[in-house]
C-alpha cells in the first residue's frame, strides 16, 4: 500500500530526518532577531550548522544513523551545551504523541524558512535560505510528508516509536544517565498498538460530534481504517518475532554502523539516492585499489550488495560494483554478466554529466546514451569494428535528437577508439553520418579523421561547459600531437610546408591546458561526491582528538574544537578529477620517454606515484609502477628491477594481459637474450604472441612487441634471413595501421640485422630511414641509438671510414651518455675502442688510456645486465690492448674474464632457474 514501501528513487520522511528537522529548529528558530538560545557564541552556532549540513550530505553508509549515534555526535558537537541539545531532542520526540502532532510539527517547520521573494532582511535576523542546502532539505521533508497517505503517516509514527525504543535499549545497556532517558522511557511505556488505531478512532468521533470537521489525515473511510488496523497489527507481530542482530557488513573504508534489530522495513531508513551513490562510488574506488589484497573480503562485499539490491533495486550501480568485485575474485563469467546488466539497466540514468537537450524530453532511458555505452563496451572487449558501427549510429541519433552532450562524448569515444585500436580504413563506416568528416574530403586517413573528431568534440564540450570532457580531450590531443605528424589536408601548392615534424611545444601546451581547466571542476553540477566526502570526513573527525590536549584528561569535556578545524579537509576533489590530473603527469612521463629524457620521465612518474597513487585507478597506478621498474632495468640492472617487480606482483592483480605480466615477460626475454638462453627467449616470445587477440586491429601494441622480440631472438640465433622476413612483415603491418613510431624501431632492427649478417651496405638505407623518422617525431634517444648503428655500419665498410664513424659517435655521445641506458652506453664505449684500434693513423701506445677507460666503463655497466656477449667482446679487446702494451698480468686477468663470459654464454641452462 502507498506509504508502507519506499518508492524507487523517492525522498522519504524518516525518524532520522525528523531528528535533523528538530535540530534545525534550534539552529534557525522562526522570527529570531539575535543569536538563538542556547548558543553563547557565533562559533557554536556555526559548528551546529556544519554538523547538520554534514548529516544531510555524508556518504559513509547506506543507512541513516541511529538515534544513539546521533546523541553521541551531539555530545561532541555541542560541547558544554550537549546535555541541553540531547534533552531537547528527546523531549521533542516525546511530545509527538499523535499523528496530529506530526502535522503540526511540519507546519511549524515552514516558519524557519525565509520567503523566496522576501525583501530586505535585517543583519541580525536568522532566516534559513530556502535555496540553501539546509533549506532545500527542509522543503523536501515538508513536501514528502504532505505526499504521505494516511497509512504512511501511521507507519511513520510507528517507526518513530521503534527509533526511540532502540536508543533507549542501547543506552540502558551501557548505563546512560537517567536525565537523558526520561523522555525515551515514556516512549518505551507507550502501547502504540492500541494507540495506533483506538486513539484516532476516538478523535474521529469527538471531532464529528463537536464540530463536524475531521483532520486531513483522519478523513478516511471505515473500510480503509479496518484494513490499516489489521496491517499495522500484523506488521507489529512480525517485527517482534523477527527481532535479531545482524553483523555489519565489513565494506572497505565504509560503514561504521551495524544493521541491528530490523524492526521495520530497512528500505525506509536508506539514505537519499545521491548519498548512496556517493557511497557506492567510494566502494568502487576501494575495490579497485584494495581488491587484490589478501585482507579484502569479497564475500562481505557480495552480501552487502545483495542486501542493497533488495532494498533499492533502482540503484543500478550495484551491478557495476558486483562486476568489479567478481573481476578481482577471478570470476570472469559472473563479472561479464554483471557488466552487461549494468549497461542494460543504467543507460541514460547514471555516469554522465548530462546537460538537458533542447527538445526537453526525458533524460531517462535515452537511446543514444545506450548506444554510446554499447559502443564503449565493444571497444573494451576488443571488437573495434562493431564499436565503430555502434558509435556511428550514436552520432546519428544524437544529431537527430539534438543531444549535444551525448554527441560530444560520442565523438571523444570515436577518436579514442581510432587512436587505440588498429583500424586500417573507415570507409563505409565513419563519415556517412557526421557532416564535418564528410564535407572535408572523401579519402581522409584515419589519422586525419581522429584529429577532426577530437577538435569537434573539444569545441562542443567547451561550449557545453563539460570541464572533465574538455580536460580529457586536451590530454587526448596532446597524445595525438605526440604520436602523429600533422600534415595539412591540402599539402600542395607554392605555400605548402615541407617541414613535417611533431611539435613538443604543442604537446606541452595541451597538457597544461588540460590541467588548467581541471581546476574549474567546481562549476559542474556533479558536486555530490565532493560534499559527501567532506561531510563524511568531518563527521568521522568528531570521534578523534583534534590535536594535543590543552586541558588535562580529568578536566572534563574537550573545548579546543572550533569551526576552523574544518581546514583539515578544505582540499578535496572528486576522484575523476584527481585521476585526470594524474593522467597528465603520466602523459608527461611518456612524452619525456619518447623524447629521450630519462630523468624527466622518472621525475614525473614519481610525482604521480607520490601525489596521486592513492586516488588513481589501479590501471594507472600499475602503469606508473611499471615505468619505474623499466627505468630500474635500463639504468640499474635486472637485480633491482626483479626485486621491484616482485613488490608490484603482490600489489596488483596478475591476470592474463595484465601490465605486470607483460613487463615480467619482457624483462625475462631481455635477460634470456643477454645470457644466451635462446630456447627460453623463444618460449617467452610464444607466450607474448599467445596473449594477443586474434582479431584484426586489437592488441596492436602487444602484437608489435611480440614480433619485434621474435625477430631479435632469430637475430641472436644468427638466423638472419628469417629475422629479416619477420621484420619486413612487421614493417608492413605498422604501415597499414599507421604506427609511425614503431616504424622507426623496425627500421633500426633491419639495419641491425644487415650489420650482423655482414651486409653493411644494405643496412645503411635502413639506418638513415630510421634517423629520418626519429627526426620527424623528435625521438632523440632513439635517434642517438640509430646514429650509433649507422656509425657501426660505416666502420663495417672498412677502416678507411673510421674517422666518419668516430664523428658520428661523438655527435651522439652527449645524448647517449646523458640519457642512455646501461646497454646503449656500453655499446658506445666498445665501439669507440674499436674505432681507435681500427684506425691505422692512431697508435695503441699513445691512445691506450682512452681505449682502456672506455672498455672498463663498458665492462662495469655490462656486469649489472649480465650481457655475456658484449662483456666478452669488451674483455677480449682489453686483453688485446694489454698484450700490445706488454702488461701480461692484466692481459691474463682480462683473458680469464673473456673465458668466463664465453662459458656462461655457451651454457645458459645454469642461469635459467634464476630467471623464473
Swiss-Prot record:
It comes from the Eukaryota. Keywords: Cell cycle, Cell division, Mitosis, Nucleus, Ubl conjugation pathway. Pathway: Protein modification; protein ubiquitination. GO terms for cellular component: anaphase-promoting complex. Disulfide bonds: none annotated. Pfam families: ANAPC5. One of its GO terms (biological process) is protein ubiquitination. Transmembrane segments: none annotated. Residues 234-255 are annotated as: Disordered. It is found in: Nucleus. Residues 234-247 have a biased composition (Basic and acidic residues). Component of the anaphase promoting complex/cyclosome (APC/C), a cell cycle-regulated E3 ubiquitin-protein ligase complex that controls progression through mitosis and the G1 phase of the cell cycle. The APC/C complex controls several key steps in the cell cycle by mediating ubiquitination and subsequent degradation of target proteins such as cyclins. The APC/C complex is required for the female gametophyte development and is involved in several aspect of development by controlling cell division and cell elongation. Involved in the control of endoreduplication. The APC/C is composed of at least 10 subunits. Interacts with PYM. Belongs to the APC5 family. This is Anaphase-promoting complex subunit 5. It comes from Arabidopsis thaliana (Mouse-ear cress). The gene is APC5.
